[in-house]
Amino acid sequence: RERGNSWDPIDTFLVNWASVATNIYDGLTYRGADLKLVPGLATAWEELDEGKRIRFTLREGVKFHDGEPFNAEAVKFTFDRLLGEEGKKGPQRSNYAAIDKVEIIDAKTVDFHLKAPDPVLLTKLAGYGAMIVPPKYIQEKGDDYFNAHPVGTGPFKAVSYEPKIGIKLEAFADHWGGAPKLSNLEYRFIAEPATAVAELQAGRVDLVIPPTIPVGMIPTIQADPKLEVVSTAGPTVYALRFNTKSGPTADERVRKALILGVDRDAIIQTILGGQAAPIASFQGALSFGNDPDMKPLPYDPEKAKALLKEAGIATGTTLQIDVRGNDSTFNEVSQAIASYLQVIGLNATIKPYETNVLLNDIIPAGKTGAMFEQAWGGWTLDYDNTAYSMYHSGEKWNPYDSDPKLDALLESQRSITDRAKREEILKSIAHYTVDRALEIPLYNYNAIFGVSKRVKNFTPVPDSRLRLTDVTVE
């Protein structure tokens, strides 16, 4: 659970924040546990001008928690704010960069004018940066007040918020989708996994949400007859990415040898308790663009040794793996990888960094070792979200590689609104990155929930956006 300091949708990128806020706010579109996009505050939409304009028909008779009416004004206010000065301060704005302006046609119709077509925009509008906020309330109370006293149109309304302690919500009886079954929700921010599990066992917590529970604590929960572990494939994928510019990993044969030299299935079973699935490219099975026919390269240490020999790599060559120091599970995984690499004659050293140092200073500046940990949880579950950031020349997460063919593929799919055509291009991008061996694709980690058996009608969601409208507690 998160130590969020602001409940303003444009201020954060934390998935845990969204598990609370998805109960307070609504977006124009909504994506539930089945990942299908359905109407939210918009009842219908149509693409005009070859995808450069989208017209939304808005739901009528909807009210914000403070009684203010939801209408076209609220939609325009929300996006003017997101794309203006206020949005500049937060991390959400770049997701919506395709939007040029929002035009009010009438009280229940708005047109989104786009700078260029964005095939993922309708999904992004279900995302938490695009939650619709109340104009009058924010103009009267100010942004700082809104941060701590959120108001939306969602099924629950905020009652009280204490930073670092928790937030209390109560059912919003006038929700357009009908009142939720629970009368109250209380979210507690518990930083320590052991404390969260102890509270679950004591019956003071009914549900612990990802990514709180480490694999090592699963047996404790499973051993308690009052509790259960519920898991589902999540959006987070892990890989060891390569320095393709210099050193031994600049050679594609060496990169392929490193992939063949690691037994990913064994790592999943022994270290991750089976709570992950192997991946063939840097995306999970739920990702739009994943090719289910593409299989991960098998563990083959003999073939790996032959490739290293062919590339002229001496036995005992040292390679550095950069990891996030606070990720204890991945530290174990990287130790196992180092042991596997020893088997094929390489000496892997592990260099831990503080997470923000690795992400903001080391990777973007191209100062990593031969390999570096990359965990990515694109909540859109659209491969573009991952692939463009990881492989396009000049992107923050791609300090080493520049491939004009890959750039052209990545750019071409961004302007295509035909889903089937786009999916084919995304699949071909995945195949191309695997042919070039741009990383060791490791695994897609599950979203793990600890649940009291008193909780009924609970459906785990892959993207942490846990809407608790149908849940009951005995």
Task: Give the predicted meaning of each segment.
Residues 170-173, 232-257, 261:
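A bilobed periplasmic-binding-protein/Venus flytrap-type ligand-binding module shared by bacterial periplasmic
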Residues 36, 126-180, 184, 302:
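Gly/Pro-rich hinge or "lid" segments in bacterial periplasmic/extracellular proteins
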Residues 144, 171-219, 347:
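Ligand-site clamp/hinge motif
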Residues 156, 277-310, 327-332:
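Structural transition elements
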Residues 57, 93-136, 160:
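Surface-exposed binding/hinge segments that line
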Residues 1-49, 80, 151-152, 450:
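N-terminal lobe/hinge region of extracytoplasmic solute-binding protein
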Residues 43-88, 105, 111-113, 199, ...:
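Aromatic- and charge-enriched surface segment that lines or borders ligand/interaction sites
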